[in-house]
A protein has these predicted regions:
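Bacterial N-terminal signal peptides
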Residues: 11-24
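Generic secretory/membrane-interface signal
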Residues: 4, 19-20, 36
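N-terminal secretory signal peptides that target proteins for export/translocation
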Residues: 1-9
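Conserved RNA-binding domains used in RNP assembly and mRNA/RNA metabolism
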Residues: 25-121
Length: 121
């Protein structure tokens, strides 16, 4: 190979590596962990208003009954937006309660990949 060809390949490789690094940094920045606050409810009553369904005597009982009886999922409602939650088992523990969820949001599916969930103060 000629030195001109080697130089071209070297610059091409450097350019590709730089592009890959930039793409990785952008992806990481858009998918960083965030804290979301709201109420654990179900996607049958996504605004956490259980007055219409009343499948239980409390919001917790109603939320769990809807998930168990209607094949729906636990979601987080923050007062404006409803988010699907990746950890349905942890969500069950906090059904009908206000929580703080730390996780990564997939903005195409509105699903939070849950890292942790605790009762809100």
């Amino acid at each position: 190979m000629t030195s001109l060809c080697l130089s071209f390949m070297k610059y091409l490789l450097i350019g590709l590596l730089a592009s890959a690094l930039l793409a990785s940094a952008t992806m990481f920045a858009t998918q960083s962990r965030q804290t979301f606050s709201g109420t654990i409810t179900d996607d049958e009553c996504p605004s956490a208003d259980h007055s219409g369904m009343r499948m239980g005597s409390t919001d917790t009982a109603c939320t769990i009954a809807c998930v168990d009886d209607h094949t729906v999922e636990f979601v987080l409602f923050d007062g404006e937006q409803t988010y699907l939650l990746s950890d349905q088992d942890k969500s069950r523990e906090f059904a009908g309660k206000k929580v703080a969820v730390v996780g990564t949001l997939d903005s195409t599916t509105w699903t939070i990949q849950v890292n942790s969930m605790v009762a809100a103060n």
